[in-house]
Design a protein with these regions (language model features):
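DUTPase catalytic domain/fold
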Residues: 1-184
Length: 184
């Protein structure tokens, strides 16, 4: 969708971004901001001789350290952090979203997602981001700073079974949500 289409979709209530700031609308995307939560894997919770996390045991939440972000935080090289967007989004059943990194962060070696950049039709909630620092130096982040962008595409028809049905494990997620692999 173009900026005009995005603004119209939000104005009609068909697409929801909350809180919404029109200044964050770009020519064909919306910049989303860093929320106030981060979860980091604690090395003392990684078990086994080979340092393997068994994701089939549980949702992984006890392997993660929770931090409420009130001030800047630093991601060191080689670090993986689950964070969240400040905004909650609600995608209509005839649209999909794609979360992409911002080039300003990519040029510092930061990726904002590993594989989970696709947002299904019908999804509602905050978007969990999978930040990694692939660069040579630590990078500082401020809660509320623009961290990623979301691009929207209209489908030719609404999804028959949009996200949000009883098997949708991340629907209405709030905060940095760990893997639900053990529920697959």
């Amino acid at each position: 969708l173009s900026d005009i289409d995005i603004i119209e979709q939000i104005g009609s209530g068909n697409l929801v971004i909350d809180p919404y700031e029109e200044d964050n609308v770009e020519p064909a995307s919306v910049d989303l901001r860093l929320g106030k939560e981060a979860k980091l894997v604690r090395s003392r919770y990684i078990s086994g001789d080979k340092g393997i996390i068994d994701a089939s045991e549980d949702d992984g939440s006890e392997k993660l350290m929770y931090d409420e972000l009130e001030q800047p935080f630093i991601i060191s090289p080689g670090t993986f952090v689950l964070t969240t967007t400040l905004e909650r989004v609600k995608i209509p059943s005839d649209m999909v979203g794609h979360v992409l990194g911002r080039s300003t962060l990519g040029r510092l070696g930061i990726s904002v997602h590993q594989t989970a950049g696709y947002i299904d039709p019908g999804f509602e909630g905050q978007i969990t981001l999978e930040l990694s620092n692939h660069g040579p130096a630590p990078v500082s982040f401020d809660p509320g700073q623009r961290i990623c962008q979301i691009v929207f595409e209209e489908l030719s028809s609404p999804a028959l079974k949009p996200y949000g049905h009883e098997d949708s494990q991340y629907q209405n997620q709030s905060g940095a949500t760990p893997s639900g692999m053990s529920f697959d």
